[in-house]
Curated annotation (Swiss-Prot):
One of its GO terms (cellular component) is ribosome. Coiled coil: none annotated. HAMAP family: Ribosomal_bL20. This is Large ribosomal subunit protein bL20. PANTHER family: 39S RIBOSOMAL PROTEIN L20 (PTHR10986). One of its GO terms (molecular function) is structural constituent of ribosome. Gene3D superfamilies: 6.10.160.10, Ribosomal protein L20. GO terms for biological process: ribosomal large subunit assembly; translation.
Amino acid sequence: MPRSVNHVASRARRKKILGLTKGYFGARKNVWTVAKNTWEKGLTYAYRDRKNKKRNFRALWIQRINAAARLEGMSYSKLMGALHKAGIEINRKVLADLAMNHPEAFKAIVAKAKAA
């Protein structure tokens, strides 16, 4: 009995990957093995960078809060300690947004933290 090969599924699978690598440079877009490896590596980078994104944004928020806090005569760590002591539960993302876009509101929060 001859060997059974599902050419339709194989071709569809390869076409799918080559479609996903459309727009890549050189052999990465049209040579099956190179395209497959590039696509898989891209998935790895995407997974890694979804984790790094959280780290990077937290660091950015801390830098922004620190810069704004120093304008008010406090360091970041002193401000966060004072906020905790004052019972002000506000996350770093919102605090950084206030520091950048609403400095008067940030000043009010810092004043309340200093008073506590």
